[in-house]
Amino acid sequence: MIGVYLRSVIFPLLFVIQTICQPPGNVFHLGFLHCDVLENNVEGSTTYINYRTSASAASIAIDKIKREGLLLGYDFKFTILYDQCDENIAAGNAIKLFAEHNVDVLFGPTTNNAAMPVFILATYYNIPLITWGITSSATLDDESRFPTAGMLSIGSRSLAVTFREVMKEYGWDQFVFAYSLEMNDEKCETLRDDFQNMVAYYGDIVLSYAVQIMDHSEEGLLAILKDVSTRGRIIVPCFHEGNSRGLHRRWMLVAARNGFVNDEYVYIFPSLRSRGYAVPQADGTFRYPWTEATGPQPGDQEALLGFQKSIFIVDMQGQGNVGSNYTQFEHEIIQRMKEPPYNCTDACASPEYQTAATYAGQLHDSVYIYGVVMDQIMKTVPNQYKNGTAFPRKMAGVFNGVGGTVAIDEGGGLQPTLFVLTLDSNNNSSLIMTVDVDQQEAVVTKHYTNEATALWSHRKGIRPPDQPICGYTGSLCPANVFFQYIGWFIAAIIIIFFTIMGAILAFIYLCHAKQQEVERQNALWQIPFKSMMTVTKKGKGEHSMRSISSVPSTISSTRSSTLSEVGETRNYLFFQIQNDVEMERVAAKKHSIRMVFDNKTCATMRQMRLIDHANLNKFIGMSLDAPQLYSVWRFCSRGSLADVIRKASMQMDGFFIYSLMKDIINGLTWIHESSHEFHGMLTSKNCLLNDRWQLKITDFGLRIFRTHDQYNKSDRLWTSPELLRTDDILGSREGDIYSFGIISAELITRSSVFDLENRKEDAEEIIYMLKKGGLQSPRPSLEHDESIEINPALLHLVRDCWTERPSERPDIKQVASQLRSMNTNRNDNLMDHVFNVLESYASTLEDEVAERMKELVEEKKKSDVLLYRMLPRQVADKLKLGQTVEPETFDIVTLFFSDVVSFTTLAGKCTPLQVVNLLNGLYTIFDGIIEQHDVYKVETIGDGYFVASGVPRRNGNEHTRNIASMSINFVKSLADFSIPHLPGEKIKIRVGFHCGSVVAGVVGLTMPRYCLFGDAVNTASRMESNSKPGQIHLSEEANQMLMRLGGFTTEPRGEVIIKGKGVMATYWLLKMDESAAPKILKKKQD
């Protein structure tokens, strides 16, 4: 009853799925022929092509077509019928689809039996047909007979071509073929015919024997093995791949138990429905072919010995084993079968329907490719959309299928990639080669470096021949001559022994030398952090070189002024390292990853350091012991291209822009043609300029760090839309071309990327619009200054580089060729061009420089005059030369202090401005007097006046004479001094001086002062504070100095209590003889 209900209600033979009602002219009618195991229990269809585990792949493909903006304005209508893998049902339902439902295209059938009549009918109705699944017959691949058919399934002819490539690769010329026609499966018969056709077509290998297996018991298989063993050693068994897959195990078990598994025999299993050594189960899991589905059995290990001598040729790509998104695709198929329009819930709930069909990906790719091709047809020749004869030729190309790249030839047939597998030494499936098949031709890609270990690990590393060494009867081996020539054999063995020993020793020496060379090269790129000298700048935190506690500068004597101006950035630090000749300036890029450098990574570092290209920045090495991981690159003094554009410090003409673009292309050409393949993160920030205006690309090759580095949103503005959508941080060649276009726009417009400063959108909004794509996808403006001559072809080239579709962008060779064609009859040397530009400004600049120099000299004179008034000349001269002014001790000097008597009372009678004018007039008189003496005015504080002699210029014992003479002149000068606003008031001063030792030095960075320190300063100040108005008070030491000099009259004051000193004997200076006047008068400090 359940079966009747399912047949009559849930799965009628015909139902129509119409997605969205659209006008008839805008709806494509898609027809499908599926095989449903409930109606006809076709063995294997559950695993490979069952409707319940594959049909929704078409809807997923339609979603992808719409996401990619294909066939805009069109909808799709589905009509699904079941052929039940039967040719009669298939023919009848095909006529219904073509004649009654008037479908525009037919997808299916999925088996060889059902396909033949449908192919004929599609040709008759001239309707496009795309088949998928397990249709493998080479007959269906006849373009002349079936011109309307495109095939995404792999034909057995591709297996035959791949098999021939395996035979040729390992030097085998002959093989035997044993096949079974169990379950009436045409697979092996078709394969036999294709093998025979392949042998006849090429003529370079021989099918020695072909035999059909009639008896599948162990006895029958043993008889076949004995038969074929007399005809060949390369044995190709072929069995049905449905529920009878146990024949593979039974065959190998019989071979192992009866002596047909040894180093002579090779068993090659060609299969399109197999995954090699992974046998799929109904629940989606896998088992090994040497085991039973029911679990471990006796004989599993014996069967394993047989499979160790085997090779599988399989279609892994067609079954979705290539591509990281395939697991999600399989899960989505099962989920969407439960949703409208399929609504397969109860009927699809069984465990065997919880895993997607093996070839569901082919159905998805068939519908998707139809959408891509039809989009092109509707844009070019819309009246040909239903022309079946023309359709297969339009399918030619490469498409991004759900399981990986799908290549279609000119006839609409799949260009498959077949996988050749064997068991490695650990009995794990190992891919040894892939074969890309195109019609009768093939391209072989080996996936091993050592054939002995990769293929023959179970054969002692020896490749087996295709026939016994001595022939099948042993007649090919000569008689044993060992004993006849035993002496020669012994001599040969000795020679060989010593030769081998010599070779071993030479090999050991070479290995040791190679290891030493590797270690030497590793030492070159491993840069110790302690050898990297940081370049510092003088700042607020540094001690003054002019203070009394000055110490030698901490600034490196080898620092570069250019480096010191750069400083640390978010991504870079700047250092100097010692190379073979001199200190070299470097930039260290910060990486936020810590990792162990294995041999492969070390080899990459060695290769990176050997790169020396005119337009690639030199990679110096890595600093592994730094606080964080640094990659070290040569420093380019002019900074990045982005910096040059932002600062607008260089006037760029058309040739200058062209030269920089050419440098970028030269660097990218090398990268694209090298093992690095592409840059991946090309921006104007990592296009650097050296002092010769030569552009060098940096930050290339170290892709291992890029996935862990931190990037701002603005750093992604140069990334192509397709990479932004996938969050691919590594990049591609096409992405580099896009980035080059964006950088070129910056150069042409001399503005930042996307002119962010003048746009209303920020970086994140622009990236969102780039990801979204479409007709409104933003691109930089190419409007440039009309004074700059830009070749219009250059603007077209830039627009081609940033086109939305990667496939439509020119490759690096095309870009380089077009750039060369734009620079005819011009010198390619940018430096010569820059020099020519500079020469045109030379005369004007010389005059301007001379004028500026004259102004500079005048300003310097004024500055020197001001400086000499603030500091002693000899001190100022040292500071101007950048020399350190060390604190200095003076054993004997004379120190003078004075202040105005009752200054506070006097100031109270004046306004602040009058006080300033009063002191300015008084000090102007005093300054004129000190100019006549060998003294130095230390400072004035309010009404206090501090003068010293004997410092900083030593003058023997004349310092006391100069201070005494100056003091007397100070007192005398006040007799004629009057206060303009207080004519009745008279100024009187108190004077005191003392002789003693002091320490002198420069203090401070801002307004530095030449200061004196010591007890003598305090004593001199006390002489002044204890003096009387109009009197000159001096200490006993000063009095003794005057008495030794002579010419001065003093009188004792007596003992006076001095604060901080106790009782001191002091004196008054009364007068000075003219003969005692200082000999050094009106002398400037020198």
From Swiss-Prot:
SUPFAM superfamilies assigned: Nucleotide cyclase (SSF55073), Periplasmic binding protein-like I (SSF53822), Protein kinase-like (PK-like) (SSF56112)
Pfam families: ANF_receptor (PF01094), Guanylate_cyc (PF00211), HNOBA (PF07701), PK_Tyr_Ser-Thr (PF07714)
Principal location listed in the UniProt entry: membrane
Leader sequence segment: 1-21
Top-level taxon of origin: Eukaryota
Span of domain Protein kinase: 560-836
Membrane topology: Single-pass type I membrane protein
Gene3D superfamilies: 3.40.50.2300, Nucleotide cyclase, Transferase(Phosphotransferase) domain 1
Residues reported to bind ATP: 566-574, 589
Reported tissue expression: Expressed in both ASEL and ASER neurons throughout late embryonic and early larval stages. In adults, expressed asymmetrically in ASE left (ASEL) sensory neuron.
Record PANTHER family: GUANYLYL CYCLASE, RECEPTOR-TYPE GUANYLATE CYCLASE GCY-6
Domain notes: The protein kinase domain is predicted to be catalytically inactive.
Role description: Guanylate cyclase involved in the production of the second messenger cGMP. Regulates chemotaxis responses toward the salt ion Mg(2+) and to a lesser extent toward Cl(1-) in ASE left (ASEL) sensory neuron.
Family: Belongs to the adenylyl cyclase class-4/guanylyl cyclase family.
Protein name, entry field: Receptor-type guanylate cyclase gcy-6
Source species: Caenorhabditis elegans
Gene name of the record: gcy-6
